[in-house]
Amino acid sequence: MDYLTHKLLDPTRAKSCIQSIQRDQSLWKDGKSTAGLYASKVKNNLQLDKKSKVSIDNSNLIIKAIISDLLVKSFTIPRKVHGVMFSKSSKGNSYGMHLDNAYMSTGRSDLSFTLFLSDPGEYEGGELAIETIQETRKIKLPQGHIIIYPSTTLHSVEEVTSGTRIVCVGWIQSYIPNNEDRKILFSLDAGAKGLLAAHGQSHELDLVFQSYNNLLRRLGG
């Protein structure tokens, strides 16, 4: 599995976040200011001033939710969640195909995430399009759900044709930089935890957890 979709926030918390960041419209700036040289040419949206108190406070709440979620932790093995920002797209806005920078001022981007804050019934279009070798997957998730995918992936945001799409985006620097290594560890962790839940602790399972942690040591970067 190259990407993870998961309910991170309940709809009430997502709505509360939207109300908070929408209170002062003067804090929303041209999104081109946070894009790289190439990406800025295809970026057409608004972003909340990252230095504002409301952005910092809500970013910290979302970072806390990410690093405390057991499934997300197992999938990402996070060293650092960084570059968190809030994006707003209204009718006519889009973000063309691009690749996230490998290194940012806040850290290395191993994984990218989009947390859907708006109810999908409140806007048309605005799907996150992730390009794979064989196809382009278009993703539009329920309110409060997150998608996490490798930052090595080309992706875009389809044009919003009506309503307003508000999301939180950011990056994760993992203890395991390589995507294939993370996938192996994720499967091993899921299998071991499943066996523990089904059969309880055993010496054989201790050996599996030992191998998992020793792989973390060997593959960590």
Curated annotation (Swiss-Prot):
UniProt cofactor note: Binds 1 Fe(2+) ion per subunit.
EC identifiers of the protein: 1.14.11.-
Domain Fe2OG dioxygenase: 80-174
Cofactor field: Fe(2+); L-ascorbate
Molecular functions (GO terms): 2-oxoglutarate-dependent dioxygenase activity; iron ion binding; L-ascorbic acid binding
Enzyme class (EC, first level): oxidoreductase
Residues binding Fe cation, per UniProt: H98, D100, H155
InterPro entries attached to this UniProt entry: Oxoglu/Fe-dep_dioxygenase_dom (IPR005123), PKHD_hydroxylase (IPR023550), Pro_4_hyd_alph (IPR006620), Pro_4_hyd_alph_FE2OG_OXY (IPR044862)
PROSITE patterns membership: FE2OG_OXY
Keyword annotations: Dioxygenase, Iron, Metal-binding, Oxidoreductase, Vitamin C
Gene Ontology biological process terms in this record: DNA damage response; intracellular iron ion homeostasis
Residues at which 2-oxoglutarate binds: R165
Protein name (record): PKHD-type hydroxylase Pro_1271
Organism, scientific name: Prochlorococcus marinus (strain SARG / CCMP1375 / SS120)
